[in-house]
C-alpha cells in the first residue's frame, strides 16, 4: 500500500511538472488599449484598441486605430495575425498620405514583435504630396499598453 501511494504521488508530481513547464504554442497579445508611437504623422497620436478576432482564432487580434486629436483623420480597423513571433496586418487607409491641404490613400502593412511590441510600418501610395509620384516609405513604431 505504501509503495502504491508513493508511485501515485510521484506520477502526480511528474504530471503537474509537465503542465507547468510546457511552453505555450503562441503568445497572444494582451487585450487592451495601446499608444502606437511613430513619426509617420506628427499631427496625430494613434490609439489602438486591441481585442480578440471575432473568429477567436489563436494568434489573431482585431486592431481599431483611433486618431488623437480626431480632426481630419480617419479611424480604421484590421485583423493582425501572429506568425513566427510577429504580428502582421494590412490596412487600406483613405487618408494615409497627409499633405497640408490634401490627403491621399495608402496601403499600410504593420509588422511587430509580439514580445517587445516594436516593429515597422511600410506604407505604399500612388500619389505623393504636391502631385508627386507614388512610393513606399518605412517607419519604425512601438506600442505601449496603458
Q: PLM features: residue spans?
A:
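Generic secretory/membrane-interface signal
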Residues: 1, 128-132
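A short linear-motif detector with a strong N-terminal bias
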Residues: 16, 26-30, 117-123
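N-terminal helix-cap/turn-to-beta initiation motif at the start of protein domains
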Residues: 22-35, 111
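Central antiparallel beta-sheet cores of small beta-barrel/beta-sandwich binding domains
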Residues: 28-30, 36-105, 131-146
Amino acid at each position: 500500500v505504501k509503495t502504491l501511494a508513493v508511485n501515485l504521488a510521484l506520477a502526480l508530481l511528474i504530471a503537474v511538472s509537465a503542465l507547468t513547464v510546457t511552453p505555450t504554442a503562441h503568445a497572444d497579445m494582451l487585450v487592451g488599449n495601446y499608444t502606437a508611437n511613430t513619426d509617420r504623422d506628427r499631427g496625430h497620436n494613434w490609439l489602438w484598441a486591441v481585442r480578440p478576432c471575432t473568429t477567436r482564432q489563436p494568434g489573431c487580434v482585431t486592431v481599431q486605430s483611433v486618431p488623437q486629436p480626431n480632426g481630419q483623420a480617419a479611424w480604421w480597423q484590421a485583423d493582425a495575425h501572429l506568425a513566427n513571433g510577429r504580428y502582421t496586418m494590412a490596412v487600406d487607409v483613405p487618408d494615409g498620405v497627409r499633405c497640408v491641404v490634401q490627403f491621399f490613400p495608402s496601403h499600410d502593412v504593420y509588422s511587430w514583435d509580439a514580445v517587445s511590441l516594436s516593429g515597422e510600418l511600410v506604407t505604399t501610395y500612388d500619389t505623393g504630396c504636391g502631385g508627386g509620384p507614388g512610393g513606399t516609405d518605412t517607419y519604425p513604431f512601438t506600442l505601449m499598453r496603458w
